[in-house]
Amino acid sequence: MPEPARPATASVPVEGTLLAFDYGEKRIGVALGNTVSRSARALETIPNRSVDFRFAQISRLVGEWQPVGFVVGMPVHPDGEEQPMIKLAKRFGNQLLGRYGLPVTWVDERYSSIAAQDAGASDDVLDAEAARIILQQFFDEHA
């Protein structure tokens, strides 16, 4: 049985802004939320063109929103098995930690994209809406 995904750091921010990511090979959905209000909103979708482009966009968001931590969706299969994308999502989370030195927490995202589609999200905001669902799940689990 695979080991469950663990956060890159053990500390979960108590108060402040969080950025959440639905990592994909083509696009990265981004959501924003606050630990005090415990509410999340879809922010934007970043084309995953290259490492440099990806982190230039994320650095812009970090500068603008000054987050105290990150939440990254982990693509676990419905039966609990790890999907091939999980290695890429873990690497992405570790890159966030290395670049920004902020805590990273992973959340099981197995149905976030389906939930975003069911909520009627259009293709251009689907990934950002999935990130919002991931972040809201984080808030709900840490209430």
Swiss-Prot record:
It is found in: Cytoplasm. The keyword Cytoplasm applies. One of its GO terms (molecular function) is nuclease activity. Pfam families: RuvX. It is an enzyme of class 3 (hydrolase). InterPro entries: RNaseH-like_sf, YqgF, YqgF/RNaseH-like_dom, YqgF/RNaseH-like_dom_sf. GO terms for cellular component: cytosol. PANTHER family: POLYNUCLEOTIDYL TRANSFERASE, RIBONUCLEASE H-LIKE SUPERFAMILY PROTEIN. Could be a nuclease involved in processing of the 5'-end of pre-16S rRNA. Belongs to the YqgF nuclease family. This is Putative pre-16S rRNA nuclease.
